[in-house]
Amino acid sequence: MKKVIPLFIIAAGLVIAGYGGFKLIDTNTKTEQTLKEAKLAAKKPQEASGTKNSTDQAKNKASFKPETGQASGILEIPKINAELPIVEGTDADDLEKGVGHYKDSYYPDENGQIVLSGHRDTVFRRTGELEKGDQLRLLLSYGEFTYEIVKTKIVDKDDTSIITLQHEKEELILTTCYPFSYVGNAPKRYIIYGKRVT
């Protein structure tokens, strides 16, 4: 009996580690597939006209209505060499595919709060390296938009004051769980605020 218990513990550990590895590989595969879809979605304005004139951008903006779970664009973070797909929605299935766009928040040129969320152990695992002044870029079918990080903040996971859905000024907000190395459901949230520069 004494030999069976250690073997059972080792087997259970291997099963848990194997499942964790499978989930990580599965999520990375979904993210890569969604990035391909997002690249196609973000190319549409250039392919349609060969240029980025304001009339074409307005037409593309008017038809820009991503459905839940659909790739809507790309988030580029030059400092950490990241190119991440943006998916409409923040449910668990959506976040497995990439960075989730909070459904009730806005998109660029809508003069409101743009909220993007991602997992700290997948798409946003290196966001802790970002600093004030670093750039974030959104590539959508109707244009490219650059934001500069103006501040970061750590809040309690139950703090609902971050997502205000204000409609007074355009701001980009990235949210992820914190601490980054925490195992399990993290008690805090890491928030990055960006202001539009182009």
UniProtKB/Swiss-Prot annotation:
* InterPro entries (alphabetical): Sortase (IPR005754), Sortase_D (IPR053525), Sortase_D_1 (IPR041999), Sortase_dom-sf (IPR023365)
What GO MF annotations does this protein's record show?
Answer: cysteine-type peptidase activity
Q: Where is this region: Disordered?
A: 36-67
Q: How does it sit in the membrane?
A: Single-pass type II membrane protein
Q: Which residues form the signal peptide?
A: none
Instruction: Give the UniProt subcellular location, in the record's own words.
Output: Cell membrane
- Knockout consequences: Mutant releases elevated levels of the sortase substrate YfkN into the culture medium upon phosphate starvation. Inactivation of the gene abolishes the cell wall anchoring of a fusion protein composed of a beta-lactamase reporter and the C-terminal region of the sortase substrate YhcR.
The record's GO CC annotations read: plasma membrane
Which chain regions cross the lipid bilayer?
Answer: 7-25
* GO BP annotation list: proteolysis
Q: Where is the composition biased (Basic and acidic residues)?
A: 36-46
Q: Where is this site: Transition state stabilizer?
A: 189
From start to end residue, where is composition biased (Polar residues)?
A: 48-57
Explain what induces or represses this protein's expression: Preferentially expressed in the late stationary phase.
Q: What is this protein called?
A: Sortase D
Query: What taxonomic classification does the UniProt entry list for its organism?
Result: Bacteria, Bacillati, Bacillota, Bacilli, Bacillales
